[in-house]
């Protein structure tokens, strides 16, 4: 069969398997996930052997040390994958939950019940742990999943998927409910994105170029997990010590993640007093500051910021800094350059905090707290499949509930419409 025919077959089988999966009880789904976790840990040696093939190929291709680190699986990371599956098993099952119920004047009882979306396609890049994480969230929420990982992790992804499918076979659950596109050619992705009759949703996880490619080529609805150009605005009433502490955490704790801080905006009324000690503190942490002309008056060691810096997701120890006239200017800047991810105001003015919350439309707006809290676990949602920057169908961290939709249920007693 051609690649197109094989991808179509995978999608058809996933669609058929999704029907059986949607009927599984919470108990069976949890048993499956717990056994999958045990199987991953039991198969640590084999998984590391397959991962070694990907690492060797990556070194030959000249992948950066950072890329190789994302690709690498060791015993600790495999245990982390297993623990993530156990965490998903511990979460409440949203499927079948009746979210609302009301009575009509004619006596009908009308409600809304959560149901799986059906078949979810995940397109992702180098981190092989996504294979297990995405599968767990989709399966727990009653969805079949079709996975297409990066070519650089093909051996690792195949081994992880095979391990999980082995448990499904043992429990009599259709293995096609967890499918991996086995091709490294781009044609495999393109054909997957054409299966609009069989796949209900595509979620791309990776860099900006991958997400743009998926959006431009998909016939299936896409939820974008786009770049994180996250901002923090130091208001005129801000507590300087608090602001500096939050900025350091948001920028330096894990600079390579999407909820790390990338742009700092400072009210002009506090620029002269806030910037010099702040710049000294960040410099001691090896953070490169890039500022506009006004910022550089108070931090002359900062590099000159260009137009490109305001829209940059650095994912490293670089921070773009700008002095703004007021909150209007700060909000305008965020609306122009932001990616709808995470935005912070540091302020002691309640009215300003409320206005910032109302007028900034990102997926998470924070007052006096780090951007790093825009995370499913930190917000109390449990595991997440990613942070959506698309307002339809979900916005912000996507947990189990966000992988479902609702249907109307109606209870009658013989009513007919007049």
Curated annotation (Swiss-Prot):
Alphabetized InterPro entries for the sequence: Ald_DH/histidinol_DH, Ald_DH_C, Ald_DH_N, Aldehyde_DH_dom, G-glutamylP_reductase_CS, Glu-5-SA_DH, GPR_dom
State the pathway, as annotated in the record: Amino-acid biosynthesis; L-proline biosynthesis; L-glutamate 5-semialdehyde from L-glutamate: step 2/2
Reactions accelerated catalytically: L-glutamate 5-semialdehyde + phosphate + NADP(+) = L-glutamyl 5-phosphate + NADPH + H(+)
GO MF = glutamate-5-semialdehyde dehydrogenase activity; NADP binding
Q: Which GO terms describe its biological process?
A: L-proline biosynthetic process
EC number(s) on file? 1.2.1.41
- Alphabetized UniProt keyword annotations: Amino-acid biosynthesis, Cytoplasm, NADP, Oxidoreductase, Proline biosynthesis
Source superkingdom: Bacteria
- List locations, semicolon-separated: Cytoplasm
Q: Name one GO cellular component term.
A: cytoplasm
The UniProt function text for this chain reads:
Catalyzes the NADPH-dependent reduction of L-glutamate 5-phosphate into L-glutamate 5-semialdehyde and phosphate. The product spontaneously undergoes cyclization to form 1-pyrroline-5-carboxylate.
Family stated for the protein in its record: Belongs to the gamma-glutamyl phosphate reductase family.
Name of the featured protein: Gamma-glutamyl phosphate reductase
Organism encoding this protein: Trichlorobacter lovleyi (strain ATCC BAA-1151 / DSM 17278 / SZ)
The organism's taxonomy opens as:
Bacteria, Pseudomonadati, Thermodesulfobacteriota, Desulfuromonadia, Geobacterales
């Amino acid at each position: 069969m051609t690649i197109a025919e094989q991808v179509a077959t995978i999608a058809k089988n996933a669609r058929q398997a999704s029907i059986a999966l949607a009927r599984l009880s919470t108990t069976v789904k949890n048993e499956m996930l717990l056994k999958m976790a045990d199987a991953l840990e039991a198969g640590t040696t084999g998984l590391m052997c397959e991962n070694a093939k990907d690492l060797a190929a990556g070194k030959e291709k000249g992948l950066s040390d950072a890329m190789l680190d994302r690709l690498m699986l060791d015993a600790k990371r495999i245990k982390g994958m297993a623990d993530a599956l156990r965490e998903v098993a511990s979460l409440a099952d949203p499927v079948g939950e009746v979210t609302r119920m009301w009575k009509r004047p004619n006596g009908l009882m009308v409600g809304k019940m959560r149901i799986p979306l059906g078949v979810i396609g995940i397109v992702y890049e180098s981190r092989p742990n996504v294979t297990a994480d995405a599968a767990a969230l989709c399966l727990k929420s009653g969805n079949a999943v079709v996975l297409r990982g990066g070519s650089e992790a093909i051996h690792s992804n195949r081994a992880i998927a095979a391990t999980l499918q082995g448990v499904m076979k043992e429990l009599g659950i259709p293995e096609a409910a967890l499918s991996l596109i086995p091709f490294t050619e781009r044609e495999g992705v393109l054909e997957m994105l054409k299966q609009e009759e069989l796949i209900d949703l595509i979620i791309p996880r990776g860099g900006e170029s991958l997400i743009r490619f998926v959006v431009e080529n998909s016939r299936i609805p896409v939820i974008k997990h786009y770049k994180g150009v996250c901002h923090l605005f130091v208001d005129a009433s801000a507590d300087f010590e608090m602001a500096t502490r939050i900025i350091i955490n948001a920028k330096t704790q894990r600079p390579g993640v999407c909820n790390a801080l990338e742009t700092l905006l400072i009210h002009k009324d506090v620029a002269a007093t806030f910037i010099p000690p702040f710049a000294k503190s960040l410099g001691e942490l090896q953070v490169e500051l890039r500022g506009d002309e006004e910022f550089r008056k108070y931090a002359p060691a900062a590099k000159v910021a260009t137009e490109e810096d305001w829209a940059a997701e650095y994912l490293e120890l670089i921070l773009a800094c700008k002095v703004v006239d007021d909150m209007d200017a700060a909000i305008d800047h965020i609306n122009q350059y932001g990616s709808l991810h995470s935005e912070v105001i540091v302020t002691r003015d309640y009215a300003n905090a409320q206005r910032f919350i109302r007028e900034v439309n990102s997926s998470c707006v924070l007052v006096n707290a780090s951007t790093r809290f825009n995370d499913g676990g930190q917000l109390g949602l449990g595991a997440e499949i990613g942070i959506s920057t698309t307002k339809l169908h979900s916005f912000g961290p996507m947990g189990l509930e966000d992988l479902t939709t609702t249907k109307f249920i109606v209870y009658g007693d013989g009513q007919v419409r007049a």
